[in-house]
């Protein structure tokens, strides 16, 4: 976690809190299905920890916004279903904290991501 750090864009003076997370790289060896349970566990832990930090940040700053990316969906080849399931699980765990969860996706929003946003 990087708490209360500056944004590195010209003219931005607000502070943000960043969670540095990663997913398991499942594309380098063994069949993908052998990695699934472990990869899902890593994704669940990353999103749960991020939302836990968002709750702490909201209690300190009053800002309830949290922006999530799709961890491991690129070069690491984590299945989109695993990623979305992990986000869904974490948002259910923290549903009582009124966080404003936003999904940031590369290029354009996919139908599955739009559907998830409607659910959460």
Where do the protein language model's features map onto the residues?
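Macrodomain-like recognition of ADP-ribose-binding/processing modules
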Residues: 1-66, 71-120
């Amino acid at each position: 976690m990087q708490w209360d750090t500056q944004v590195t864009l010209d003219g931005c003076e607000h502070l943000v809190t960043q969670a540095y997370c990663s997913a398991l790289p499942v594309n380098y060896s063994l069949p993908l299905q052998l990695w699934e349970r472990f990869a899902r566990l890593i994704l669940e832990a990353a999103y749960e920890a991020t939302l836990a930090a968002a709750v702490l940040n909201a209690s300190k700053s009053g800002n309830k916004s949290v922006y999530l990316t799709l961890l491991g969906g690129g070069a690491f080849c984590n299945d989109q279903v695993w990623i979305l399931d992990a986000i869904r699980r974490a948002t259910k765990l923290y549903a009582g904290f009124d966080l404003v969860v936003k999904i940031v996706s590369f290029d354009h929003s996919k139908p599955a991501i739009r559907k998830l946003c409607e659910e959460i």
